[in-house]
Regions:
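Cleavable N-terminal signal peptides of Sec/SRP-targeted secreted and luminal proteins
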Residues: 2-18, 539-552
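Short hydrophobic alpha-helical runs that function as membrane-insertion/retention elements
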Residues: 181-184
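A post-motif C-terminal structural segment
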Residues: 33, 43-60, 72-77, 87-92, ...
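His/Cys-centered metal/cofactor-coordination and adjacent catalytic loops
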Residues: 148-164
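C-terminal GPI-anchoring signal of eukaryotic secretory precursors
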Residues: 520-542
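N-terminal secretory/membrane-targeting segments
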Residues: 8-9, 13-74
């Protein structure tokens, strides 16, 4: 074994120069910046696409780049975990076109490693954000609507043994490894996805005590999500908490910072309780100026609640000219990273949700969904550009899909928000983007005659409030059951490959960061010294060296 390691080490030194570019976090190939990333622009098509040589050259360039890629085999000192809520493959593809062209790439699509994850719950084929959060954050599949409680417990139960049935995952393991931790979302911070980072509850809707007591349960024995954020094992140790949902922290008899009443029934102001629990070097902020004026050098804990409920959509912030008051997702990620990266000797774990993609799809408003996906991509680009590839693992995925399809046979350069074609049955137009179900049904078919479609060209399809075509009437469009993509970049990102169950992701992340069950041994997860891991590492390095030698022999 020593001889193998010596040979591999020698080879790695010889080829290190060829991989230097790959290991730099801001190199053009892996993380190139797009000129269209800051907003929509007209589609641009390279005239050279009309030649065969164009495509052959592009293929060869891609092959060459792939052969130059080498895995970063090292412990992930830092982890940034992004979840685009409801970000289906169709949503990603449509967002490329929204930003200018089919052959554009979102920031995370440029990551070198790609996997897919199966999203079903234990008791549902199509998942919600609660059971999926439990899977991709804590490593266990559970029942629809439940967060971090075992699937043997039924939803809404408040008679189970909490000690035997509840659990937490990645954020707890990170804290046990003395990493700084943070949760960022543009939903309510108590919503299902962010709650998966710190709470255990049998009903995702129990965001404050009023919902628990209305269900006939004792909120002192089965605490609500907001209470767990302030007083729970993981929540009380979070260094940075940014999102919406002030109402769940404020009593119904009090007004919040923007003069909106709270919804708690127990009379407790959890914002004040958080302040009391963090009397030194901590700050609470509720608007963008407060967020941007944080004294990063001296502050250790931040609680930011920027809305009574969910944050506004990006386009709503722009329309209402609230950019100076309401932070967008990229603003929050930037602020969180400034807090987390100030101690160069300490690792961190940042969990980020782009929540409004999902909400826009539920509303059957694809322009909002695509703009939220673009903002999500911008936040990831920011994170990758200001962190080092050799010590920061970034994983990007989604919790579930949606029923939106990207369909028809529109010509290149067509507006993704426009008409995709005309039916050869009724002669009427149909949109390139449409939904299998949702409120858009009522705009798609004539009232009183569901057999006859409406001429959809009469609608302003560029208006972000316009509902798009849907086949089945629902008051809210549903989730989709397809697999979701997983993108990875940084240390040990190469283990994110192939198709897997969604609950495998926490194992991969904790293995890369050496936290949780992989903290105390060599990383095999079997409680034994890591000899198997060392052998696998040697084999991987030998493969990398062999590919590099092959690359040097090829003629380009």
């Amino acid at each position: 074994m020593k001889a193998v390691i010596t040979v591999v080490t020698t080879l790695l030194v010889a080829v290190a120069a060829t991989n230097e570019v790959h290991r730099s976090y801001d190199n053009d190939h892996q993380h190139q910046r797009s000129s269209s990333i800051n907003g929509r622009q007209a589609a641009t098509i390279d005239p050279a696409e009309a030649t065969s040589d164009f495509w052959r050259q592009k293929a060869q360039e891609t092959l060459k780049a792939k052969l130059q890629e080498a895995p970063v085999i090292a412990k992930a000192k830092n982890v940034i975990y992004f979840i685009g809520d409801g970000m289906s493959a169709q949503t990603i593809a449509a967002t490329r076109m929204y930003l200018g062209n089919e052959n554009k790439m979102l920031s995370f699509e440029q990551f070198p490693y790609l996997a897919t994850a199966k999203t079903y719950c234990v008791n549902r084929q199509v998942a919600d954000s609660a059971c999926t959060a439990t899977a991709y954050l804590s490593g266990v599949k559970t029942n629809y609507g439940m967060i971090n409680v075992g699937p043997h417990v039924p939803r809404y139960s408040c008679t189970y043994n909490r000690t035997e049935s509840e659990f937490l995952g990645l954020l707890k393991w990170a804290q046990e490894a003395d990493m700084a931790t943070a949760v960022v979302t543009n939903a309510r911070i108590t919503h299902a996805t962010p709650a998966g980072a710190y709470a255990s509850i049998t009903n995702r809707d129990w965001e404050d005590d009023s919902y628990v007591t209305n269900a006939g349960c004792d909120a002192t024995k089965y605490p609500d999500v907001a209470h767990q954020l302030v007083h729970g094992e993981v929540g009380k140790r979070l260094n940075v908490i940014l999102g919406g949902g002030r109402r769940h922290f404020v009593p119904s008899t009090q007004m919040d910072d923007e003069n909106v009443a709270g919804s708690r029934a127990d009379g407790r102001n959890l914002i004040n309780e958080w302040k009391e629990a963090h009397p030194n070097n901590a700050t609470y902020v509720w608007n963008k100026s407060g967020l941007q004026s944080i004294d990063v050098t001296n502050i250790e804990n931040v609680l930011g609640l920027f809305d009574s409920s969910h944050s506004l959509y990006n386009l709503e912030i722009d329309d209402q000219r609230l950019g100076a008051v309401k932070p967008k997702l990229t603003d929050m990620v930037d602020a969180a990273l400034k807090m987390l990266t100030k101690d160069k000797d300490k690792g961190y774990f940042l969990f980020v949700e782009g929540a409004k993609i999902d909400m826009a799809h539920h509303d059957s408003r694809p322009r909002l969904a695509l703009e939220e996906t673009a903002e999500f991509s911008r936040a990831i680009e920011l994170a990758r550009n200001i962190t080092a590839l050799d010590d920061t693992l970034i994983v990007v995925s989604s919790d579930h899909g949606h029923t939106m399809t990207y369909n028809g046979y529109p010509k290149r350069g067509s507006d993704i928000l426009g008409i995709g074609g005309y039916s050869d049955e009724d002669g009427l137009p149909y949109t390139t983007l449409s939904y299998a179900n949702g409120e858009g049904y009522y705009l798609t078919y004539k009232e009183g005659n569901p057999a006859e479609r409406v001429d959809f060209s009469q609608y302003d399809l560029t208006d972000h409030q316009t509902l798009y075509m849907a086949t089945v009437p629902l008051n809210a469009e549903s989730h989709g059951g397809e697999d979701v993509a997983v993108f990875a970049s940084g240390p040990m990102a190469h283990i994110f490959r192939g198709n897997m169950e969604q609950n495998v992701l926490p194992d991969l992340i904790s293995y890369a960061a050496k936290i949780g069950k992989y903290k105390e041994n060599g990383g095999d997860g079997d409680g034994q010294p890591g000899s198997g891991s060392s052998l696998a590492l040697c084999i991987q390095l030998m493969v990398v060296c062999g590919v590099t030698v092959l690359l040097g022999q090829l003629k380009w």
